[in-house]
UniProtKB/Swiss-Prot annotation:
CDD domains in the cross-refs: SLC6sbd-TauT-like
Gene Ontology terms for molecular function: amino-acid betaine transmembrane transporter activity; gamma-aminobutyric acid:sodium:chloride symporter activity
Extracellular face residues: 137-207
Knockout or disruption consequences: Mutant worms are morphologically similar to the wild-type but exhibit mild swimming defects and are lethargic when crawling on a food-free environment with their movement being interrupted by frequent pauses. Worms paralyze in the presence of exogenous betaine. Simultaneous knockdown of snf-3 and egl-8 results in uncoordinated, hypercontracted and paralyzed animals.
Gene that encodes it: snf-3
Subcellular location: Cell membrane
Protein name: Sodium- and chloride-dependent betaine transporter
Length: 600
């Protein structure tokens, strides 16, 4: 009889490790934040962006200064904070992206698709803005800025620098007027003729601006390598992109406040105008700015929250993030308007003649003021570096939100992450190519105005809030927060989620439709009819999927059920849902308890 070989029994530690591995094999590895501040920093990197630095200060001035701030704070309390907290909480609790989380309320799954479409629209053009900023940053490394003079090959006879004496300027204007034209500053000609090679017509592509093409390619490579191991592994990139812009903002703020005329700019920034509170345009601009700057409705917050551990204090992070976002906008306002006050002082013009809306504020106003600053090269490089970083970090987080939603819906993408991510980055790069043609800025304006903000965003956010508040259940969101971190919110938050937040987004959507104005060229002319029609098509892409999927669900699925039963199941009226993370925690506790008892 042969001797049998002794096989040692596995230790408790080995069993626990085996248990953990088996559970990970059942659920695909989504990746989790490992550091205490990873989630907070990722939200800062995502939500704090170009809208805070330039769009907020401009809108604040345009709409009455202090009056705009009052309205902004109202929307901040009624919509931004509640919806922000709602998205983060549900993402963490369900451990799903924007599409798959709606399996708990399938009638609203079209909302998740709408989130993905809006993110798709925004991702398509964000790297183009980054390319513009990088182009300016590179151009700033010169003793004389290329936009300072009219002696460049792209300048024509209508060019003025603003530094001519009165007699010379009058002569140039008279000469140009006699030819039926108008003068352009050297800054404007650099932007239109050198950076964009602008044809002035969205219909005339005119070829590719190859410098922007290659810079955009470099930007997409940065995005790819920041994400190829998953955003939870890109800690250094996230932290750098979240924190470094604040260094630059405070440098610009300190420098701006020490400039002559800064007080004039601050006064215009904060000047109260109570009569503007009755102006519907103020409410529309403040509301849309709140939704856009806090990044709700894109699915990215849900995705970032889904990478949290089940018991992570997402409530504290969400409230902190909302406070940081608001303070960043206000601080950036002081920095920007102190500099604009200096411009007003130097040019002896009213600020209303200096400030220009949209991308023009960043790429026309600042190059002009940088030319008159001491150590101009340093401040120009710092400013456009800040724009570049803010664009890249928002792009990375939006891409993560989109890719997480698609990975949850199609798990094979997670298995081949590097390859599939590369294909997606290449796809979006190709979509961006028309936006680096000679009419590219107009295509970007179209995507921004119709596809990624305004009507489409507000429409999707309305149904998202309704679906979460009534499908998932406002009381269940409050309960989920308590289960995860032990925080019990006041009962009143349920009424905010069920009534205030949906009403706010719906009213803003109606405002946008009622006060609709076709998109215009910078010179005030309307885009052609076909372009605005295409814009409405872009908007409809994210809107029609919501009722479209609901119709599909009610009439083409679960045919063995009655229509009433399908509605009941689609709205999850039975409240049957469970957090995968919570289930894993329970299973862990039960099986480890069994291991301990069996080993004794």
């Amino acid at each position: 009889m042969g001797t049998s070989e002794h096989v040692p029994l596995p230790t408790d530690e080995a069993k626990a490790k085996e248990l953990e591995q088996s559970q990970h094999s059942e659920e695909p590895d989504r990746g989790q934040w490992t550091g205490k501040f990873d989630f907070l920093m990722s939200m800062v990197a995502y939500a704090v962006g170009l809208g805070n630095v330039w769009r907020f200060p401009y809108l604040c001035y345009k709409n009455g200064g202090g009056s705009f701030l009052v309205v902004y704070m109202i929307f901040f309390c009624l919509a931004a904070v509640p919806i922000f907290l709602m998205e983060v909480t549900v993402g963490q609790y369900l451990q799903k992206g924007a599409m798959e989380m709606w399996l708990m309320c399938p009638l609203f799954r079209g909302v998740g698709i709408g989130n993905v479409v809006i993110a798709f629209m925004c991702i398509a053009y964000f790297c183009v803005i980054v390319a513009w900023a990088m182009f300016y940053m590179i151009s700033s490394i010169a003793w004389v800025f290329p936009w300072e003079t009219c002696n460049n090959y792209w300048n024509d006879a209508t060019c003025v620098t603003g530094k001519e004496n009165f007699t010379e300027l009058a002569r140039i204007k008279a000469l140009v007027a006699s030819a039926g034209g108008h003068t352009q500053t050297s800054v404007e000609q650099f932007w239109e003729k050198r950076v964009l090679h602008d044809t002035g017509d969205i219909s005339e592509f005119g070829g590719i601006q190859w410098e922007l093409f290659f810079i955009m390619a470099a930007a997409w490579l940065i995005v790819y390598f920041a994400l190829w191991k998953g955003i939870t592994q890109a800690r250094k990139f996230v932290y750098f992109c979240a924190l470094f812009p604040y260094v630059l903002i405070f440098i610009l703020l300190i420098r701006g406040l020490t400039l002559e005329g800064a007080g004039t700019g601050i006064y215009f920034y904060l000047k109260p105008n109570a009569t503007r509170l009755l102006d519907t345009a103020v409410w529309k601009d403040a509301g849309t700015q709140v939704f856009y700057s806090y990044g709700v409705g894109f699915g990215a917050l849900i995705a970032l929250g889904s990478h949290n551990k089940f018991n992570h204090n997402c409530f504290k992070d969400a409230i902190t993030m909302c406070f940081i976002n608001g303070c960043t906008s206000i601080t950036a306002g002081f920095a920007v308007f102190s500099i604009l006050g200096y411009m007003s002082h130097v040019a002896q013009k009213d600020i209303s003649e200096i400030v220009k809306p949209g991308v023009g504020l960043a790429f026309l106003a600042y190059p002009e003021v940088a030319s008159n600053l001491p150590m101009k090269q340093v401040f120009a490089v710092l400013f456009f570096l800040m724009i570049t970083i803010l664009g890249l970090d928002s792009q990375v987080c939006m891409m993560e939100g989109l890719f997480t939603a698609l990975e949850d819906a199609f798990p094979i993408l997670r298995k081949y992450k590097k390859q599939s991510l590369g294909i997606f980055c290449l796809f979006f790069f190709c979509i961006g190519i028309p936006m680096v043609t000679h009419s590219g800025s107009h295509w970007l304006t179209l995507f921004d105005a119709y596809g990624a903000s305004g009507y489409a965003l507000l429409f999707v956010v309305f149904f998202e809030v309704v679906g979460l508040a009534y499908g998932f259940g406002a009381h269940n969101i409050r309960k989920a927060l308590h289960e995860m971190i032990g925080v019990t919110l006041p009962k009143g938050i349920e009424y905010v989620w069920k009534f205030c937040a949906p009403a706010t987004s719906l009213v803003l959507f109606v405002f946008c439709v009622v006060y609709y104005h076709p998109v215009k060229y910078p010179d005030g002319k309307d885009f052609p009819f076909w372009a605005n029609a295409f814009g409405w098509f872009l908007s409809s892409c994210s809107m029609v999927v919501i009722p479209g999927y609901a119709i599909y669900y009610l009439f083409f699925t679960n045919k063995h059920l009655t229509l009433k039963e399908r509605v009941r199941k689609g709205l999850n009226l039975d409240g049957s849902f469970e957090s995968p993370a919570k289930k894993n925690l329970v299973n862990n506790a039960e099986e480890l308890k069994f291991i301990e008892s069996s080993s004794q």
